[in-house]
UniProtKB/Swiss-Prot annotation:
It comes from Beijerinckia indica subsp. indica (strain ATCC 9039 / DSM 1715 / NCIMB 8712). Substrate binds at residues 138-139, 275, 284, 293. This is 4-hydroxythreonine-4-phosphate dehydrogenase. Belongs to the PdxA family. Coiled coil: none annotated. Its EC number is 1.1.1.262. One of its GO terms (biological process) is pyridoxine biosynthetic process.
Length: 337
C-alpha cells in the first residue's frame, strides 16, 4: 500500500445534508486523484457509501500518517463518533456539532502542516446555532481557529472571480463596514489570491457601492470618500486596481477579459453573478489563511439529502482548485499592515 504524501483533507460537512454523499461520489468519480482524506464521522461516511450501493471500504485512521492509497478504500480520520445517524434533511444540534468538530480537527491538521489544505463540504448555519456554536459561517470559523487576522472570500469559476469587502452581515451593516481598511484588505487579498492562482499581474476591478458607482455623488458619496482613496493607496503599493466601476456592468467586463478579479462591496453583489453562471462551476476560496481552503459554491441541500441524486461537480471543482493553489505566503496569509 502506498502511503499518502501531505494530502488534502475534505471535511464531511453537515451529516444531515448532501456533504457525505458528494464526497463519496467524488471518490468514485476520481480514481486518478486520491491524495486526500475525509475528516468527519466514520459512521456517517459508511452510511453514505452504503446508500450508493458501492463496494468501498472505510478505513478509520487516527492520524494522517496512517492514510494509504488503495483501490476501494476511503480514509476517514474520525473527528467525532456518533452512536446513531442524525435525521437526514433536518436541522439538528448533533449534526451542527459534528460538522463543527470536523472543521476544527482539519484546521488543527493544517496548522500542524500534516495536510496541504482543506476542502470543506457544506454546513448549515442553523445547525451550528442549535449546537450553541455562534459563527456566521465557515469563513469566520476558519479565520478564528486558523489564527488569521485578515480574511476574504473569493468566489471563482472559469470565467470570473470576485472577492468580497464584507461577507455575512445585513446590507445595512455592510454599508457601514465597507470602510477604508476593509477596502484595502479586500484589494490586497484579491491581488494575492489571483497570484496564488498563477496570475502574475492581476487586474483588479473595484465595484462601487451605490447605483452607477454613486454617479459623482448624486446617489451616495462612499465612492468619493472611501473607495477611490483606497484604490489610489493600493495602486501606490504596486497593485493594478481600478474603479470604482458600476456594479451592474463590471462583471460583464470581467467576463469579457478586461479584469482578472472584481472586488465586490457586499455578499449578494459578488455572489449573484458567479452563482448565476452555475452552482456546479463555482468555488469558494478563503483568502488570508495560512493554508489552502476551498469549498463548493452551494449549501447542504436538505431537500435532496439522502436520495442519491446530489451532484458532486462543484466539490470536484473545489478539489481541483485546492490542488492548483499555491500554499499561502506570509503576505497572503494576513501579515499585512
Amino acid at each position: 500500500m502506498v502511503m499518502l504524501d501531505h494530502p488534502l483533507a475534505v471535511t464531511m460537512g453537515d451529516p444531515s445534508g448532501i456533504g457525505p454523499e458528494i464526497i463519496a461520489k467524488m471518490y468514485l468519480r476520481r480514481p486518478d486523484k486520491r491524495n486526500w482524506i475525509v475528516v468527519g464521522d466514520p459512521l456517517v461516511m459508511e452510511h453514505a457509501i452504503a446508500n450508493l450501493g458501492v463496494a468501498v471500504q472505510i478505513r478509520r485512521i487516527a492520524t494522517v500518517e496512517e492514510a494509504g492509497c488503495e483501490d476501494g478504500v476511503l480514509n476517514v480520520l474520525a473527528s467525532s463518533s456518533l452512536a446513531t445517524l442524525p435525521a437526514v434533511g433536518r436541522v439538528s444540534a448533533v449534526s451542527g456539532q459534528a460538522a463543527y468538530d470536523a472543521i476544527v480537527t482539519a484546521i488543527g491538521l493544517a496548522r500542524q502542516g500534516t495536510i496541504r489544505g482543506i476542502v470543506t463540504a457544506p454546513i448549515h448555519k442553523e445547525a451550528l446555532a442549535a449546537a450553541g456554536i455562534h459563527y456566521p459561517g465557515h469563513t469566520e470559523i476558519l479565520a478564528e481557529q486558523g489564527g488569521a487576522q485578515h480574511v476574504a472570500m473569493m468566489l471563482a469559476n472559469d470565467e470570473i472571480r470576485t472577492v468580497l469587502v464584507t461577507i455575512h452581515c445585513s446590507l445595512a451593516d455592510a454599508i457601514r463596514k465597507a470602510d477604508f481598511p476593509a477596502q484595502m484588505q479586500a484589494i490586497r487579498l484579491a491581488h494575492e489570491g489571483a497570484r496564488a492562482l498563477g496570475i502574475v499581474q492581476p487586474r483588479i476591478a473595484v465595484a462601487g457601492l451605490n447605483p452607477h458607482a454613486g454617479e459623482g455623488g448624486l446617489f451616495g458619496d462612499e465612492e468619493i470618500r472611501i473607495i477611490t482613496p483606497a484604490i489610489a493607496a493600493a495602486r501606490a503599493e504596486g497593485i493594478d486596481a481600478t474603479g470604482p466601476w458600476p456594479g451592474d456592468t463590471v462583471f460583464m467586463q470581467a467576463r469579457l477579459g478586461k479584469f482578472d478579479v472584481v472586488v465586490a462591496q457586499y455578499h449578494d453583489q459578488g455572489l449573484i453573478p458567479v452563482k448565476f453562471m452555475g452552482l456546479e462551476k463555482g468555488v469558494n476560496i478563503t483568502l488570508g489563511l495560512p493554508f489552502v481552503r476551498t469549498s463548493p459554491d452551494h449549501g447542504t441541500a436538505f431537500d435532496i439529502a439522502g436520495r442519491g441524486i446530489a451532484d458532486s461537480s462543484s466539490l470536484e471543482t473545489a478539489f481541483d482548485y485546492a490542488t492548483r493553489l499555491k500554499v499561502p505566503t506570509p503576505f497572503f496569509s494576513g501579515a499585512m499592515s
